[in-house]
């Protein structure tokens, strides 16, 4: 005599339970509504409409901090699109190229093994430039 | 004012929507519907002139239009909700169809997100200050919304202080919230307004007029004597000058300049400059 339920009957009972639970869930029986794309945006703020100046003002040096702020905020608001195209260089391009040239040698020397130090010789100016290429194995021609 | 009123009354009686472009600068009344430029061709006057069919689909060439204060969206049209003059601004950077709004006048302020206002601290409860901004509810201001404020380093704000801040939350469903820093965490002039000075109230339209980029009144006032002014979009102005008399003169000028013509104003300024 079997005490527990049969596996099949168990499955059936589970399925029935699931069905009851899912039918209890509510759903809206409406047709699909398509959201209309609206071309009009509503804004209640006057900031978009009119270019207003910054609200704090000071005249004839009464409050120097506010005068500085006035210049900052009003300039930001007027010249937002003007960008500085001429960026002043601190270091010229040629000097940069020269530095890089010697830099490669200096850093390379740091990682080179003792035997390879011969490759890095200092010339008159003290600039370290790698002179020779590494010695490779040359296969005999025969 | 009789002429624009009669014109408006005629159009309302005819109940025909007018094109927004033709009404720019004229007085509009609440309840009027305005057509946007793309639609006025389709609903052109009568059928007397037959328009040739255009092969390119009109629907694709619609641009986004922003309807500002005083206007609402009603289907595809704009519905006027306040009386005033209709204004339009062309888009600066090319995207969108520009902004339409109604230039109206009112004294009661309704909090709007992003507006800089002057508020008066009315209560201090725990970590929040209640600030009266002239709206239907006092705005809340957290003590952490000041520059350089931490839990240990609290800002020095007492009841009765004047605060210049901006709204971060302001809609009809929630209590307005304001802060005294910008999105980067800098104060930018916001915070507690200093000692002395005089706070008075004017209409909202005057504030916008005074803050316009080419306002002559402000330029002339600035030449009189050293002074400091703070404008709040809620109709409040705070002024301060070296002596009490100068402060009072300034307050009177700003209050009165709304109803003066430019000649009267120039007379008053020249009289002041002499004395």
UniProtKB/Swiss-Prot annotation, chain B:
There is a cross-link at residue 151 (Glycyl lysine isopeptide (Lys-Gly) (interchain with G-Cter in SUMO2)). One of its GO terms (biological process) is nuclear-transcribed mRNA catabolic process. PANTHER family: EXOSOME COMPLEX COMPONENT RRP40, PNAS-3 RELATED. CDD domains: KH-I_Rrp40, S1_Rrp40. It is linked to Pontocerebellar hypoplasia 1B: A severe autosomal recessive neurologic disorder characterized by a combination of cerebellar and spinal motor neuron degeneration beginning at birth. There is diffuse muscle weakness, progressive microcephaly, global developmental delay, and brainstem involvement. It comes from Homo sapiens. Pfam families: KH_6, RRP40_N_mamm, RRP40_S1. This is Exosome complex component RRP40. The gene is EXOSC3. It comes from the Eukaryota. It is found in: Cytoplasm; Nucleus, Nucleolus; Nucleus.
